[in-house]
Regions:
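Short, solvent-exposed coil/turn segments at beta-strand boundaries
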Residues: 85, 102-110, 122-128, 143-148, ...
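Short solvent-exposed loop/turn micro-motifs enriched in small/polar/acidic residues
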Residues: 95-96, 133-136, 144, 154-155, ...
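Residue-level recognition of conserved beta-strand positions in structured domain cores
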Residues: 113-114, 153-155, 162, 173
Length: 193
């Protein structure tokens, strides 16, 4: 990662709480985003495997409307040790209160869609190179460790952790620790924070 990319990403990270307060993200308006798909009991019984779907990337200029589900129709069960993080989540506690993200999972694959970007990773697979915060190019590897999804910058430095604690999703991103609740319906059915 180039020094300019690091400075750009660091500056964007420090300003993220202010950006979210000034421009609160909108939750997906269509109900299909909120449905948690049924997974097959075993990998052998799965009709579609996670690697049957092409890898998604952040589109040029980022997305402004929630993109379709990347793993729609995939029923491959989660790999052993993977926490079930699937769903649409909103931060209700922490510096990034209001943040909304959609997490899709199947097999070892996890797709995190939020803030105009799409991170499509395979835990234990090759690192993903895509756009990060502030437009900086990032190289990130995913690993399931101790019931957590950990993301490593350049496959070395742990920078993001997601795990379940009761019904909450705990998301640590850089210096920020946030608690998220699962949204089960489009915005008109969810109480404001």
């Amino acid at each position: 990662m180039k020094l300019g990319h690091i400075a750009k990403a660091f500056g964007a990270m420090l300003l993220a709480p202010l950006r979210i307060r000034r421009h609160p993200p909108e939750a997906p308006s269509d109900s299909f985003h909120y449905a948690i798909p049924m997974l097959a009991a075993t990998k052998d019984l799965a009709v579609t495997q996670a690697n049957d779907f092409p890898v998604a990337k952040t589109s040029q200029g980022r997305w402004t409307e929630w993109p379709p589900l990347i793993l729609a129709g995939c029923d491959e069960p989660l790999v052993e040790g993977a926490p079930d993080l699937r769903g649409v989540w909103q931060a209700y506690k922490g510096p990034l209160r209001g943040h909304i993200e959609r997490v899709e999972q199947a097999g070892a694959r996890v797709v995190i869609t939020a803030g105009g970007i799409i991170h499509d990773l395979t835990a234990g697979g090759i690192p993903m190179t895509d756009e990060g915060l502030g437009g900086a190019e990032i190289n990130v590897a995913a690993r399931y460790e101790d019931g957590r999804l950990n993301l490593y910058l350049n496959n070395k430095r742990l920078v993001v952790t997601r795990y379940r604690e009761g019904s909450d999703l705990v998301w640590r991103w850089g210096p920020y620790r946030n608690r998220l609740r699962r949204l089960n319906d489009p915005p008109k059915n969810n109480p404001p924070l």
